[in-house]
Amino acid sequence: MSLENLSCQKSFGGWHKRYKHHSDVLGCDMTFAVYLPPQAEQGGKLPVLYWLSGLTCTDENFMQKAGAQRMAAELGLIIVAPDTSPRGLGVPGDPDNAWDFGLGAGFYLNATQEPWAKHYRMHDYVVQELPALVEAHFPASDKRGISGHSMGGHGALVCALRNPGRYLSVSAFSPINNPMDCPWGQKAFSRYLGEERSKWREWDACVLISEASEQLPLLVDQGDRDDFLAVQLKPEALQQAAKAAGHRLEL
């Protein structure tokens, strides 16, 4: 699969690059950003952190604003940031042009309902297609970590819990912990997955943690003055689920 380089900037001795490619999984062209630390030019394979951004974001937000490249350069760590949804001609968005569903709000799941099912398969893209592409074109090893913020934090937790052995670490900043029980999640799940709540359980970290076959420790960072804390994020739900399952969680 070919890559088209869209931009390239020197950063902390390495390179911050942006690429476009066609995704067979999503049925559209996608962009992603990658940081290649200085060690990428020295030979050998490097570990990769996949970063999943939140609602309304693109592949550029974290890579342009977070400043994580400095630490990645020190650690010899590749960072890969995909977009937050499929985009482009023929990809449906929210019929009301809302910001919390559709374009920029793919929720890192595999939609089953029309018209979303054809394109909104962000889970398979993030877990399977994108890493295969990255490992084919860059000096990236199969030592993977995954992290994210808000909707992306939800995505990181779900990707790790659903795919034992796929990641060596998982962490999240202010994640949507219990999407089945918050307005953002309920809106997205009802449209992407339908009204049958039993199908929602497959994409909720609080449910998945009780069924996890791998005890991969979870690291969650949450500010106690977050405006969305009580209604949307619900870290206490994840804490209770982890305690009940005996799953290690640092919150």
Which sequence ranges carry the predicted segments?
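Non-catalytic cap/lid and distal C-terminal segments of serine-dependent acyl enzymes
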Residues: 1-251
